[in-house]
């Protein structure tokens, strides 16, 4: 397809003539059939809802086709309308646009749907099994059309993938406001998602999937590297560490690369051969093993030789854990990144049942499938418990492993009624990073030029090294890890999709790096605008009692004021787009999370937006964490108040335990 044809296709939106039906591409990793949950009348409603995107002249042709999709796949994806052009993040100037900010958003959307990046690209799923950009291809086409037409005096409103329309606003307002899965709390159970999504009225946006901010597995590589590094430090000793986990999907696929960067032997189980081979072909995992005998031998050899290597076991994770326990292999670090936020719809596959049979069972015999999953979790936990008794440090990686294992009746609870194992936020990420404002800051070079990315890496390194000279002792370790990360980033070949980078930085670091980028754009040192953003998995963006806010102990870990305030505050301080989601990470109904994107172009407006918005985006969460009496956050917010005129935060007073105990003796 020529550039002119691409531009015409974007501008057309819903085509005037029906495109030809497309052949189902079996070389692409597809989403499993979803649960058949709708009644006969609800299926008619789903069909009526889908057809409202199209003129009447198409209805007679599309109605049976969409009905067949609903019966075959459990959703109406509108495959016929999937564009025939290649999906990837093009340089910003290749998109038809009246607003440069809108063109940047188009680039970010296409990156989320790139087949090299997305988990189920033809079903518009970026990662996590159900993390959707849109619900169907009509929504994609309309959104791209609107973005190509809009000006900086308009805002596009997005309801769970559906473009409500373009509304008049002003240049300092967000260009796009996104909500995903915002349902009434009483209707936020997993089956409510299944029903609403099948009806075409809501979607699960995960975190960066539905907010157009995914940068491929690099995003999670950095967080996983930091987690594994610090977990290894907790374990101590100078032996070669063995790290065992599961999942090679859109997010979990980062684990082998993170293991290599952290300098360990890693073994990652993955049930889906397509996913495992994809990561191997991309160079994100070194070895594939399908035979447990050969794998065990390879593990022993690598540990003995102290050879850093990443291995993938193409099979069920329970078989792996049980074999490790049976062989008395010493595992130093253990975790799990299966998509247990979505346990009944392809996020976790039970032991003893093939991938194909599981996909059939979850759609046709959902109750039996649930029983198999829960039985599998009980066996997995039993094997993990045996290995932790022999010295393994196990941590929950925020995927609802502990939560779903407890619901399955596994031996996962301690004597105090709390989980036997910590979440990684409780033990590592929370007290060492989030409490001090360090989180997953990221940027994308809209030129698509690797040279621009190299320039940003150099600038970020210079900023962090300068900060380190005057840093307090409690954050020097965090700065050192991130300086090392950014210096090695190019060598580690982390880019998949757009020219993007991530590093963990605090409020001061993010602001100084962004201002330095903006100055470099102004000078022409960086050739085109840069998109700033972050994962929702951050200091302020997410309220999640089993992950991001699991180290909040004042009882407010189940409250979502922080995440909601964050997106509101970002929206009027300079964000180019904002999003707020139900779910993300731990699952639908368990989390409220939000994010932003900011296009900086070398202007004074960008300078102002950087200073105002990034300060709020980080310090909102530090303030909340300090009120929860987290010591690191109290220290961090005191430093910020000294640094920032006009910032006044309410600080907690500490009560002597004896006074409390005396009052309730």
Regions found by a protein language model. Give the residues of each.
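Core active-site phosphate/anionic-ligand binding loop and the adjoining beta-turn-alpha structural block
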Residues: 294-513
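Catalytic or ion-translocation cores adjacent to nucleophile or general acid/base/metal-coordination motifs
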Residues: 205-229, 233, 239-242, 246-308, ...
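Flexible inter-domain linker/hinge segments
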Residues: 311, 648-663
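General beta-strand structural signal in soluble alpha/beta enzymes
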Residues: 155-160, 178, 245, 268-269, ...
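N-terminal ligand-binding/catalytic initiation module
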Residues: 1-236, 375, 429-579, 586-587, ...
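Structural alpha-beta junctions
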Residues: 149-154, 263, 330-333, 386-393, ...
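Short, charged/polar "capping" segments at the starts of alpha-helices
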Residues: 275-277, 404, 540
């Amino acid at each position: 397809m020529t550039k002119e044809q691409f531009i015409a296709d974007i501008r057309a939106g819903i085509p005037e003539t029906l495109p030809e039906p497309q052949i189902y591409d079996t070389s692409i990793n597809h989403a499993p059939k979803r649960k058949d949950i709708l009644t006969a009348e609800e299926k008619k409603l789903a069909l009526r809802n889908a057809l409202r995107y199209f003129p009447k002249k198409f209805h007679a042709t599309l109605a049976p086709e969409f009905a067949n999709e609903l019966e075959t796949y459990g959703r109406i994806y509108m495959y016929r309308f999937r564009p025939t052009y290649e999906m990837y993040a093009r340089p910003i100037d290749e998109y038809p646009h009246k607003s440069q900010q809108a063109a940047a958003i188009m680039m970010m959307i296409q990156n989320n749907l790139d087949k090299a990046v997305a988990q189920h690209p033809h079903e518009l799923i970026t990662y996590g099994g159900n993390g959707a950009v849109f619900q169907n291809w009509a929504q994609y086409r309309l959104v791209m059309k609107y973005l190509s037409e809009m000006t900086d005096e308009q805002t596009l409103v997005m309801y769970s993938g559906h473009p409500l329309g373009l509304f008049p606003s002003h240049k300092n307002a967000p260009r796009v406001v996104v909500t995903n899965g915002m349902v009434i709390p009483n209707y936020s159970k997993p089956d409510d998602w299944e029903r609403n999504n099948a009806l075409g009225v809501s979607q699960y946006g995960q975190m960066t999937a539905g907010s157009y901010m995914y940068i491929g597995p690099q995003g999670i590589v950095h967080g996983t590297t930091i987690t594994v590094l610090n977990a290894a430090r907790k374990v101590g000793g100078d032996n070669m560490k063995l790290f065992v986990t599961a999942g090679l999907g859109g997010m979990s696929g980062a684990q082998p690369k993170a293991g290599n960067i952290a300098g360990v032997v890693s073994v990652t189980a993955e049930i889906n051969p397509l996913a495992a081979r994809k990561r191997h072909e991309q160079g994100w995992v070194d070895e594939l093993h399908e035979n447990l005998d050969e794998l065990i031998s390879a593990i022993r050899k690598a540990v003995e030789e102290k050879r850093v290597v990443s291995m993938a076991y193409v099979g069920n994770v329970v078989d792996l854990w049980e074999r490790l326990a049976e062989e008395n292999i010493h595992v130093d670090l253990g975790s799990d990144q299966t998509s247990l936020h979505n346990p009944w719809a392809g996020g976790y596959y039970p032991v003893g049942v093939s991938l194909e049979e599981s996909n059939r069972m979850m759609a046709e015999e959902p109750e039996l499938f649930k029983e198999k999953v829960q039985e599998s979790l009980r066996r997995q936990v039993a094997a993990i418990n045996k290995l932790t008794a022999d010295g393994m440090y196990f941590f929950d990686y925020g995927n609802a492993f502990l939560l779903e294992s407890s619901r399955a009746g596994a031996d996962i609870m301690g004597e105090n009624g709390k989980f036997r194992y910590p979440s990684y936020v409780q033990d590592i990420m929370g007290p060492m990073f989030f409490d001090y404002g360090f989180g997953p800051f990221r940027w994308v070079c809209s030129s698509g030029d690797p040279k621009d990315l190299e320039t940003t890496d150099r600038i970020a390194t210079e900023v962090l090294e300068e900060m380190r000279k005057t840093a307090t002792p409690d954050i020097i370790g965090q700065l050192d890890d991130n300086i090392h990360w950014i210096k090695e980033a190019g060598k580690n070949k982390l880019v998949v999709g757009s020219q993007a980078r991530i590093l963990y930085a605090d409020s001061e670091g993010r602001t100084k790096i962004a201002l330095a980028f903006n100055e470099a754009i102004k000078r022409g040192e960086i050739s085109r605008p840069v998109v700033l953003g972050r994962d929702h998995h951050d200091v302020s963006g997410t309220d999640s009692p089993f992950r991001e806010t699991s180290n909040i102990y004042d009882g407010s870990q189940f409250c979502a004021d922080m995440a909601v305030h964050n997106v509101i505050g970002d929206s009027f301080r300079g964000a180019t787009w904002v999003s707020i989601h139900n779910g993300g990470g731990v699952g639908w109904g368990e989390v409220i999370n939000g994010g932003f994107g900011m296009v900086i172009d070398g202007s004074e407006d960008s300078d102002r937006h950087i200073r105002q918005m990034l300060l709020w985006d980080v310090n909102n969460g530090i303030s909340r964490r300090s009120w929860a009496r987290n010591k690191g956050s109290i220290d961090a917010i005191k430093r910020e108040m000294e640094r920032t005129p006009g910032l006044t935060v309410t600080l907690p007073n500490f009560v002597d335990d004896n006074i409390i105990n005396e009052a309730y003796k």
